[in-house]
């Protein structure tokens, strides 16, 4: 069973990813480093790590969705 993240974590993470395309990837440590620079002194370390974790999952989910859509169209 996975942990359920609060909606504010999801909302913040999705907004950050959508407003900054191409910056984040599937690497949690990289995403955490980028977020620490973006959100400096605005959130706690625990919250920042939760956002970085969801950003990572969100990126993976988007890529998986894009891949399945391409397969359905017969392009892959």
Curated annotation (Swiss-Prot):
Keywords, sorted A to Z: Ribonucleoprotein, Ribosomal protein
One record GO biological process: translation
UniProt keyword annotation of Ribonucleoprotein present: yes
Pfam families, per database record: Ribosomal_S17e
GO molecular function term, any single one: structural constituent of ribosome
A single cellular component GO annotation: ribosome
Cysteines joined through disulfide linkages: none
Protein family: Belongs to the eukaryotic ribosomal protein eS17 family.
HAMAP family, per database record: Ribosomal_eS17
Protein name as catalogued: Small ribosomal subunit protein eS17
Protein's organism: Picrophilus torridus (strain ATCC 700027 / DSM 9790 / JCM 10055 / NBRC 100828 / KAW 2/3)
Lineage: Archaea, Methanobacteriati, Thermoplasmatota, Thermoplasmata, Thermoplasmatales
Gene: rps17e
């Amino acid at each position: 069973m996975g942990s359920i993240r609060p909606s504010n974590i999801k909302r913040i993470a999705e907004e950050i990813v959508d407003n900054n395309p191409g910056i984040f990837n599937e690497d949690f440590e990289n995403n955490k480093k980028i977020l620490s620079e973006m959100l400096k002194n605005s959130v706690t370390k625990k919250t920042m790590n939760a956002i970085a974790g969801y950003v990572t999952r969100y990126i993976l989910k988007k890529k998986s969705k894009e891949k399945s859509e391409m397969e359905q169209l017969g392009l892959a």
